[in-house]
């Protein structure tokens, strides 16, 4: 039963991370909106940026469905820390995907390493107490 839980954790993690990347990609390509000038609805709804944002929202919804399955199969104290792995996945995607092209820095890398270390420590503790 635990393996099913980890499958659903990975599915939730992948979908939530994909949602972030899709929504960011779509929002970068949409025209700017200011309080004084609103683009027409046809301008906002045209093309792939809106599709990327909508697919990202769908990915979030599917991620939540996967999370419900995680809650069925894993203890919350073991499952919830694993979701923080999405921070590392999204950071790496933002750095390595050419259209996002976000800068890598030592400080951010250390932050991601601390997150990974924390997940490892919590997971190890959960396994040791079993």
From Swiss-Prot:
Periplasmic side: 28-49, 101-102
Assigned protein family: Belongs to the ArnF family.
Residue intervals annotated with topology Cytoplasmic: 1-6, 71-79, 124-130
Role of this protein: Translocates 4-amino-4-deoxy-L-arabinose-phosphoundecaprenol (alpha-L-Ara4N-phosphoundecaprenol) from the cytoplasmic to the periplasmic side of the inner membrane.
GO biological process, one term: lipopolysaccharide biosynthetic process
Pathway assigned in UniProt: Bacterial outer membrane biogenesis; lipopolysaccharide biosynthesis
Superkingdom as given in the UniProt entry: Bacteria
Stored InterPro entries: EamA_dom, Flippase_ArnF, Small_drug/metabolite_transptr
Organism for this UniProt entry: Pectobacterium atrosepticum (strain SCRI 1043 / ATCC BAA-672) (Erwinia carotovora subsp. atroseptica)
Membrane topology term: Multi-pass membrane protein
GO cellular component: plasma membrane
SUPFAM superfamilies: Multidrug resistance efflux transporter EmrE
Domain EamA: 55-124
Keywords: Cell inner membrane, Cell membrane, Lipid A biosynthesis, Lipid biosynthesis, Lipid metabolism, Lipopolysaccharide biosynthesis, Membrane, Transmembrane, Transmembrane helix, Transport
Name used for this protein in its record: Probable 4-amino-4-deoxy-L-arabinose-phosphoundecaprenol flippase subunit ArnF
Localization, UniProt: Cell inner membrane
HAMAP family with a match to the protein in the record: Flippase_ArnF
Assembly notes: Heterodimer of ArnE and ArnF.
Transmembrane segments: 7-27, 50-70, 80-100, 103-123
MF-aspect GO terms: carbohydrate derivative transmembrane transporter activity
Chief localization: membrane
């Amino acid at each position: 039963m635990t393996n099913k839980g980890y499958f659903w954790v990975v599915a939730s993690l992948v979908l939530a991370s994909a949602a972030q990347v899709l929504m960011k990609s779509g929002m970068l390509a949409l025209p700017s909106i200011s309080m004084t000038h609103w683009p027409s609805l046809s301008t906002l709804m045209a093309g792939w940026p809106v599709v990327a944002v909508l697919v990202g929202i769908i990915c979030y919804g599917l991620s939540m469905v996967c999370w419900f399955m995680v809650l069925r199969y894993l203890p919350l104290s073991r499952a919830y820390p694993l979701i923080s792995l999405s921070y590392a996945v999204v950071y790496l995607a933002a750095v390595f995907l050419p259209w996002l092209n976000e800068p890598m820095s030592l400080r951010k890398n250390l932050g991601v390493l601390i997150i990974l270390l924390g997940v490892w420590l919590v997971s190890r503790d959960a396994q040791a107490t079993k």
